Amino acid sequence: MLNKFILFGLALSFIYGSDNAEKDNLPKAITFAGVNFSLIENGNSAVHYIWLHGDEKTAKMAFDHHISHFPGKAFFIQNDDREVPYLQTRVDPNRIFSRRGSYYALKKFKPYWPPGTLKKALDEIDKDRIQFLEIIMPNKDGVLISVHNNFRGYNVKYELKYSRKTSIKKQQNPRDFILCTREKDFEKLANGPYNVVLQDTVSERDDGSLSWESLRQNVRYVNIEARLGYLTKQKKMLAFVSETLN
């Protein structure tokens, strides 16, 4: 009888221990450069999504809708503006995925830094970046999909000179396009109705964006760019990418 109680106790310990171990593996808080990110998971998938600019509300709404219909992990920045507060300045979170990009991002709104303080800030961002990328990057079979909106005239034509292959559709608005970093993904996406560009070589113009960091890490990356306010269009583009690459 005693042996039965011992075995039962060991079984309970194993069950609760396993649950606690799984909880311990989850990040207590997801932060990067002092700003928080929320995480929404739907099922078990190697597809990761990220929304980086808080002022691009159409992209967020498209994301909210998409993650409820498609499996994956979606990371949402908890901020309402394009830039996020950092130390005594503001930085664009999509310009600090390299040390070079971080340098220019930090100096954009604060040109002068007391001796030693800029290096310290860069070192802190470097440390934060390593931890953040470990969380958001998918495994080797996965893909990282970001969503952005444009409202200042930015369009696919700005990306042509940095792209090795392009598929431009005359019937499509140039401000709506897909950027990818794998040739196989490009070939699949180019068969669809949307503008698509392939950037699979790291450029000297490294601006600190997530696309270049993904390329350096050999991670499949896709950016879905759409005009601010064109929610239906961005929903369709997201669905097309997910259905085409999975």
Located regions from the model:
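Structured catalytic-domain cores with a bias toward divalent-metal coordination
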Residues: 2, 18-246
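Sec-dependent N-terminal signal peptides
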Residues: 4-13
